[in-house]
């Protein structure tokens, strides 16, 4: 919370957030582990699109692996037991994995937009090896952007507190940097995703006018709409809560600030939900992933492996 002397952690809010984080951890680890296995062992023909999705799965898997520590933090009413270094490491990995995930979501949207709307551009000839190089640069850039804001993540003198990501009022460089970066991390990817997906839909509507092609158009529309809705659902509430936090910091109302701080805790935990929902997008976009998740689902239900659909092609690719 931004002002420890103004409000104490809410037991109800902390417990709810801790339980939600625990669920996100379990589902995120399972879904993204299956996605990673599918990428490594079942996708045979690689394109840049698949490389970016692989990196997205890695970022989501890293994020999900960090969530047990954050869940324990909330379930213990925000008491921290892993020291200053542990606090720094948790903040770094959470912020990095979330930033990288958002960057690769934008990269996927841009790649699809260029291939569908501007298919003759030379950038569409990018090889998988070049896409790996681009992915490495994205990771390095996000590391460089994440580090300056980590000065905020310092434990208290007794090493039993680990300040949250949410804004505080001291106006230091690290606070300003982190808030500006958080704003850009939402606005830029969201704007790019909306723009690219709208362009894809317009292009497909012009090309798929025949009645027999309408089912393909409808599937494409559903997929791009799903991507936009999931992004907004997970990140927009947290973005708005941070805006409200800045507003109420200047009003001097401790009660209002407490309510907004608790809202920030809840909406902040929702941003990690995207690591759980991204595998839904994989499943929606490829029969290979539908087959993998179907196998896991039937195994968990004790029914053994599901039969492959008649039109299943194990040499699936992303074009």
From Swiss-Prot:
Highest taxon above the source species: Eukaryota
CDD domains documented for this protein: 7tmA_GPR31 (cd15199)
Localization in the cell: Cell membrane
GO cellular component: plasma membrane
Principal location listed in the UniProt entry: membrane
GO biological process, one term: lipid metabolic process
Keywords attached to this entry: Cell membrane, G-protein coupled receptor, Glycoprotein, Lipid metabolism, Membrane, Receptor, Transducer, Transmembrane, Transmembrane helix
GO MF terms, alphabetically ordered: arachidonate binding; bioactive lipid receptor activity; G protein-coupled receptor activity
Carbohydrate attachment residues: 5
Record-annotated membrane-spanning stretches: 17-37, 53-73, 92-110, 132-152, 181-201, 220-240, 266-284
Residue ranges that the UniProt entry lists as topological domain Extracellular: 1-16, 74-91, 153-180, 241-265
Matching InterPro entries: GPCR_Rhodpsn (IPR000276), GPCR_Rhodpsn_7TM (IPR017452), HCARs (IPR051893)
Presence of keyword Ligase: no
Induction trigger: Up-regulated in prostate cancer.
Chain's role: High-affinity receptor for 12-(S)-hydroxy-5,8,10,14-eicosatetraenoic acid (12-S-HETE), with much lower affinities for other HETE isomers. 12-S-HETE is a eicosanoid, a 12-lipoxygenase (ALOX12) metabolite of arachidonic acid, involved in many physiologic and pathologic processes. 12-S-HETE-binding leads to activation of ERK1/2 (MAPK3/MAPK1), MEK, and NF-kappa-B pathways leading to cell growth.
Subunit structure: Interacts with KRAS; in a farnesylation-dependent manner.
Name of the protein described by the UniProt record: 12-(S)-hydroxy-5,8,10,14-eicosatetraenoic acid receptor
């Amino acid at each position: 919370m931004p002002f420890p002397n103004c409000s104490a952690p809410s037991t109800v809010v902390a417990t709810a957030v801790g339980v939600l984080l625990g669920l996100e951890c379990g589902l995120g680890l399972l879904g993204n582990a299956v996605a990673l296995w599918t990428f490594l062992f079942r996708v045979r023909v690689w394109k840049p699109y698949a490389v970016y999705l692989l990196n997205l799965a890695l970022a989501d898997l890293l994020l999900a692996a960090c969530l047990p520590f954050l869940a324990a933090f909330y379930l213990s009413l925000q008491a921290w037991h892993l020291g200053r270094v542990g606090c720094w490491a948790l903040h770094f990995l959470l912020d990095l994995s979330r930033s990288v995930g958002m960057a690769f979501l934008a990269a996927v949207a841009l790649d699809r937009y260029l291939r569908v709307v501007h298919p003759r551009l030379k950038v569409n000839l990018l090889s998988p090896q070049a896409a790996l190089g681009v992915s490495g640069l994205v990771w390095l850039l996000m590391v460089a952007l994440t580090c300056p804001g980590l000065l905020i993540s310092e434990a208290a003198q007794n090493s039993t507190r680990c300040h949250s990501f949410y804004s505080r009022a001291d106006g230091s460089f690290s606070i300003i940097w982190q808030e500006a970066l958080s704003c850009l991390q939402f606005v830029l990817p969201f704007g790019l995703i909306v723009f690219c997906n709208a362009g894809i839909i317009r292009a497909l509507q012009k090309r798929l006018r025949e009645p027999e092609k309408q089912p393909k158009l409808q599937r494409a529309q559903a997929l791009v709409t799903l991507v936009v809705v999931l992004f907004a659902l997970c990140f927009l509430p947290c973005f708005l809560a941070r805006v409200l936090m800045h507003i109420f910091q200047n009003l001097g109302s401790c009660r209002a600030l407490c309510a907004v701080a608790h809202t920030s805790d809840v909406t902040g935990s929702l941003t990690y939900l995207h690591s759980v929902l991204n595998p839904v997008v994989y499943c929606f976009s490829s029969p290979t992933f539908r087959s993998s998740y179907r196998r896991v689902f039937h195994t968990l239900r004790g029914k053994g492996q599901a039969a492959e659909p008649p039109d299943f092609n194990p040499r699936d690719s992303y074009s």
